[in-house]
Amino acid sequence: MLFRKVSVIRGRVLTPSGQGLRGVRVSNGLALREGFTLTRSDGHFDILVTGGGPVKLKFGKSPFPYQSRNLFVPQNQVMNIFLYKFK
């Protein structure tokens, strides 16, 4: 990861009823070497990614199926994404 391109994506994962979902694994499916994060007890997460290009956020927690969301992330930015509901 080039430090001059580092960006942060912040977001929140919710259950279908609107509650924050703890322990969801969030990763960049296009750059698995960048690691992953887990959502906190209120469903919020922060993940460090290489900015300046596409990111495929992958969300996973049993018993829910894995889901993904494609984003373009500018470099050197903190990006807040919309609430994400597990189905």
What label would you give each PLM region?
Residues 1-22:
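Beta-strand-rich domain onsets/edges
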Residues 29, 50-86:
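A short, solvent-exposed loop/turn motif at the edges and junctions
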Residues 12, 25-27, 58:
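Residue-level detector of beta-strand face positions
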Residues 2-4, 38-40, 48-52, 72-74:
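Surface-exposed coil/turn segments at beta-strand junctions on protein surfaces, enriched
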Residues 22-23, 28-50:
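Short, acidic Ser/Thr/Gly-rich low-complexity loop/linker segments typical of extracellular
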Residues 1-5, 82-87:
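Pro/Ala/Gly-rich low-complexity, hydrophilic intrinsically disordered segments
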Residues 6-10, 42-44, 78:
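Intrinsic-disorder/low-complexity, polar/charged segments enriched in Ser/Thr/Lys/Arg/Asp/Glu/Gln
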